[in-house]
Structure formats: structure tokens, C-alpha cells
């Protein structure tokens, strides 16, 4: 129906559009010729060398997503809050894991990289009285799809981490699962089409109104709500995964097989 809003706020029907052909909605498929488990020979690349040179730790959480505008906990991918929780989870910890952020702000420029580092450092500065903190590394710049697959398959990358407020689908999360990479993320929104609580690690939280400063018409409008991850549960799930990653890796392999069959481009064709 076509509706028109009146001065008093009421909506009046002004017409209608009738469809004379059926509509089918396809799911978003993953290119499983690219996003799949890779062997050691397939991992040989400049990217692998660069990451291994940059990141010395052998246990690394990976995040892939754009660092959008907003204050602490307001960017849609929730990266600033995620960084703070990671630091808190493993502060003063012997042999801590690392966090690798594949992120950027508006673009891939030198200025953007500096601003991204500044926003990460702002969270680190909250722990000025802590003796030791885990390392956070920034991977800033454009990667090819083949390089992204290599990144998900690197042995030291143990899990994909996201504290997102909401996703239309969550493509990087889906692609990571197809590479058999365990996923730790919020248990709400589009990513639940291909994740579950048994074969992935889901973070608890609650729906809250989108901050007024983040309203983005016509994408995010009032009175929209999005998912806010519980900070305590983020910390618990990070520590839980660190202790149980071998068992959770086994579950991720099961999910990877399911998603490569169910969410591939070939499966889209059958729809």
C-alpha cells in the first residue's frame, strides 16, 4: 500500500501497487572456490610473510570490519568497545593472545591509518595503571579476496571476533566460517542465518535504542534498536575460547562443512 503522512501524524492510504509476478528472495552466497580451508603450500604469500613478521604471538583473535563514526560503543561494528574488552580480558596475563584488526575508517589513506591508530590508543590509555597489556595490531589497507582467504587460514589466527550491533548478513563472518575459522560474535541479527550456539561462540546482550548521534536516514531511523553486547560476557567468552579453542575448532570445522554446502554460490543457483 502507498501511504501518506498527514499533518496530525496519521497515515492515509493513497493507493496500492499490485505485483503480477512472484518474487523470490535469494540468500547471500559465499564463493567457496576462494573461501575454504587451505593447505600450507596455498598459504605461501607476501601477506602471510607480512602478518607473521608483524604479529609475533601464536594465538591471535582477528576482527574484520570498518571502524565507523561514533563514540565509545557507538560505531556499528562496536570496535572501540571490543578493543577495550580485549585489553581488559588479558591484562596482566602471562603469554597473552593478540588482537589483529583488519580495519579502516573512511578510506585506506595515511591520514585514515593515523586516525584509526589514535582511536585504538584512546582505549589503551584507559589502562595506564596496568602493568602489562596484550598487543593489538592494525592491518590497514585493501586486500584481495584471495588474500582474505589466506588471512582466515593462517595457523596463528585462532578465531574471528566481532561485537557488532547488527548485520544485514555479516559476509566476513560467513566467509571465515567457510575457512573453518571459529567465530565469536553477538548472538543476534543477520549472522544468525549461518551461525548457531553449538558451533560458534555467541556473546550475550540486549536490544537498546540506537544513539541519536548514529541515526542515519533512511538506513537507521528512530525508534530503531540494535544489539548491545554485554561487556562482562565479551570478556568471559574471550577467556573461555582461549582455554577451549581446540574443542571449539573441531565444532568450527563441522560448521564450515555445513556452510560451504548450504551457503555457497552453487546453492544459490539451486534456489
Annotate each PLM feature.
Residues 225-229, 233, 243-271:
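A charged, aromatic-enriched C-terminal amphipathic alpha-helix characteristic of glycosyltransferases
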Residues 156-158, 180, 187:
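A short alpha->beta transition loop at the rim of the catalytic pocket in nucleotide-sugar-dependent
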Residues 165:
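Aromatic "clamp/platform" in nucleotide-sugar-dependent glycosyltransferases that forms part
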Residues 182-185, 199-202:
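Short hydrophobic beta-strand element within catalytic cores of glycosyltransferases
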Residues 30-147:
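Conserved catalytic-core segment of nucleotide-activated headgroup transferases in glycan assembly
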Residues 149, 174-178, 182, 189-193:
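Short alpha-helical segment that forms part of, or immediately flanks, the ligand-binding pocket
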Residues 1-46:
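Donor nucleotide-sugar binding/catalytic pocket of nucleotide-sugar-dependent glycosyltransferases
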Amino acid at each position: 500500500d502507498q501511504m501518506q503522512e498527514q499533518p496530525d501524524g496519521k497515515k492515509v492510504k493513497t493507493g496500492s501497487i499490485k505485483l503480477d509476478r512472484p518474487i523470490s528472495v535469494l540468500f547471500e552466497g559465499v564463493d567457496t572456490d576462494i573461501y575454504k580451508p587451505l593447505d600450507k603450500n596455498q598459504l605461501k604469500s607476501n601477506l602471510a610473510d607480512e602478518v607473521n613478521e608483524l604479529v609475533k604471538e601464536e594465538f591471535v583473535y582477528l576482527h574484520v570490519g570498518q571502524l565507523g563514526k561514533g563514540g565509545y560503543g557507538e560505531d556499528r561494528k562496536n570496535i572501540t568497545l571490543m578493543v577495550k574488552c580485549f585489553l581488559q580480558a588479558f591484562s596482566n596475563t602471562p603469554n597473552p593472545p593478540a588482537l589483529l584488526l583488519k580495519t579502516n575508517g573512511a578510506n585506506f589513506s595515511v591520514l585514515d591509518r593515523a586516525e584509526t591508530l589514535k582511536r585504538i590508543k584512546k582505549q589503551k590509555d584507559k589502562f595506564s595503571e596496568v602493568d602489562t597489556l596484550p598487543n593489538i595490531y592494525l592491518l590497514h589497507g585493501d586486500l584481495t579476496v584471495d588474500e582474505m582467504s589466506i588471512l582466515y587460514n593462517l595457523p596463528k589466527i585462532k578465531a574471528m571476533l566481532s561485537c557488532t550491533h547488527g548485520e544485514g548478513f555479516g559476509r566476513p563472518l560467513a566467509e571465515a566460517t567457510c575457512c573453518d575459522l571459529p567465530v565469536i560474535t553477538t548472538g543476534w541479527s543477520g549472522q544468525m542465518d549461518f551461525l548457531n550456539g553449538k558451533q560458534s561462540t555467541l556473546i550475550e546482550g540486549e536490544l537498546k535504542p540506537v544513539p541519536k548521534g548514529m541515526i542515519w536516514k533512511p538506513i537507521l531511523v528512530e525508534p530503531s534498536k540494535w544489539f548491545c553486547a554485554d561487556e562482562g560476557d565479551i570478556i568471559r567468552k574471550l577467556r573461555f575460547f582461549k582455554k577451549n579453542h581446540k574443542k571449539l575448532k573441531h565444532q568450527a570445522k563441522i560448521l564450515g562443512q555445513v556452510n560451504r554446502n548450504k551457503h555457497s554460490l552453487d546453492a544459490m543457483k539451486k534456489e
